[in-house]
Amino acid sequence: MNIYRYEENPLITPLDVKPIHEGFEVIGAFNGGVAEYNGEVLLLLRVAEKPVSEDPEIVLAPVYNAKNKELELQSFRLDDENYDFEDPRMIRSKAKLEGFSYLTSLSYIRIARSKDGHHFTLDEKPFLYPFNEYQTFGIEDARVTQIGDTYHVNFSAVSEFGVADALVTTKDFENLEYQGNIFAPENKDVLIFPEKINGKYYALHRPSLKSIGNLDIWIASSPDLRSFGDHRHLLGIRPGEYDSGRVGGGCVPIKTEEGWLILYHGATEENRYVMGAALLDLNDPTIVLKRTKTPILEPVADYEKNGFFGDVVFACGAIQEGDTLHMYYGVADTSMAGCDMKISEILHQLEVEAK
């Protein structure tokens, strides 16, 4: 399959983003949801800011205080035997077998705008910043689904309660209406379908399991995009394949004559992230028709292989223009990149590899 990576890649890097917090540095501008509005391409970037510690023996963790509406810093000494600091992204309590106690950065959503889809200008202020007790550790990985003239923006809400998926709606990317948490912890990678199917809304989601099971994609339906039920398993991991470790939703589902085209991320046990594709039935998206056996996009460029967390391509959105798909994706948990691919070629790969 032919893939055209933009010559301007990476399109946005941490160096392009000025931190909004004094004494912080931007360590990531990545995993942006995508929308078209008012003649522009909008990237709803996840911006990760990390507090700079003046003492090399102290690690700082930013926490949003939902009661007083202020950002606070927790301090931890590296010689504190109660905590594990091996992963630079988080602080783990040794008393907990899994998960983390704090993050070393705070993420929020900031919009980058472009007239041509290649050159972007960043808004100075956040589009979404933590505002309640379910977002005290940050807001991550937005996806945007347009239904009529309303844009539904869902995102991971991270706090001491876990990772939930929350929803806001907007018509102009200025005025927002908070719709609440639509999936309870532990859940992420939610993709809302852009239209009703047989009178129901549908969404893909990825529960994160603690005891048994795998990190697989599920599907649920809803009468109103607020209350989701009828949860069903949809796409699982595949031992020995590019998605043997985990799978999760990527871009908002794309309607084609052959079915709903799903572009999802898959990772190995070694955390090499690629993009794969699947085709769901047009009238019953709980039915998987086909699935790629090889990735449609994988980390090969230097900016995809090297960064804060290397060997990662992670798409959260795309824009369809006829048969061309303009896909924007996070690279190495650091920056944003873009590429063009043909929908017909993805469908052809699905057809060939289904045999």
UniProtKB/Swiss-Prot annotation:
Catalyzes the reversible phosphorolysis of 1,2-beta-oligomannan. In phosphorolytic reactions, prefers beta-1,2-mannobiose (beta-1,2-Man2) as substrate, but can also use beta-1,2-mannotriose. It catalyses: beta-D-mannopyranosyl-(1->2)-D-mannopyranose + phosphate = alpha-D-mannose 1-phosphate + D-mannose. PANTHER family: GLYCOSIDASE. Homodimer. It comes from Listeria innocua serovar 6a (strain ATCC BAA-680 / CLIP 11262). Its EC number is 2.4.1.339. Optimum pH is 7.0 for phosphorolytic activity. Optimum pH is 6.0 for the synthetic reaction. The keyword Transmembrane helix does not apply. GO terms for molecular function: glycosyltransferase activity. This is Beta-1,2-mannobiose phosphorylase. Keywords: Glycosyltransferase, Transferase. InterPro entries: Glyco_hydro_beta-prop_sf, Mannoside_phosphorylase. Beta-D-Manp-(1->2)-beta-D-Manp-(1->2)-D-Manp binds at residues 31, 46, 89, 140-141, 188, 273, 333.
